[in-house]
């Protein structure tokens, strides 16, 4: 347990950011599952719409510092390949 006032405040801030980051990552994973489900159903229009949303989530995550740029590039590429396989 921290004794210094500023560290106590930092711990609270860190916990809030951690919860926000976990929530964001969860929403990204849900978006990926939606793309995979649309591809499995062979619905190209829906898959493209879901792909756009997933790319948006990845880009926003990179801008916020939640995702590394290589992670974003790798995942965007993999999702695009998946949708283009239709």
Swiss-Prot record:
GO terms for biological process: translation. Residues 1-20 are annotated as: Disordered. GO terms for cellular component: cytosol; small ribosomal subunit. InterPro entries: Ribosomal_bS20 (IPR002583), Ribosomal_bS20_sf (IPR036510). SUPFAM superfamilies: Ribosomal protein S20 (SSF46992). Residues 1-11 have a biased composition (Polar residues). GO terms for molecular function: small ribosomal subunit rRNA binding; structural constituent of ribosome. The keyword Ribosomal protein applies. NCBIfam families: S20. Belongs to the bacterial ribosomal protein bS20 family. Binds directly to 16S ribosomal RNA. This is Small ribosomal subunit protein bS20. It comes from Acholeplasma laidlawii (strain PG-8A).
């Amino acid at each position: 347990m921290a004794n210094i006032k500023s560290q106590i405040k930092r711990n609270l801030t860190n916990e809030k950011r951690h919860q926000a980051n976990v929530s964001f990552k969860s929403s990204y994973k849900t978006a990926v599952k939606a793309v995979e489900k649309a591809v499995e159903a062979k619905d190209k229009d829906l898959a493209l719409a879901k792909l756009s949303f997933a790319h948006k989530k990845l880009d926003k995550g990179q801008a916020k510092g939640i995702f590394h740029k290589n992670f974003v590039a790798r995942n965007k590429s993999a999702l695009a390949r998946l949708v283009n396989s239709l």
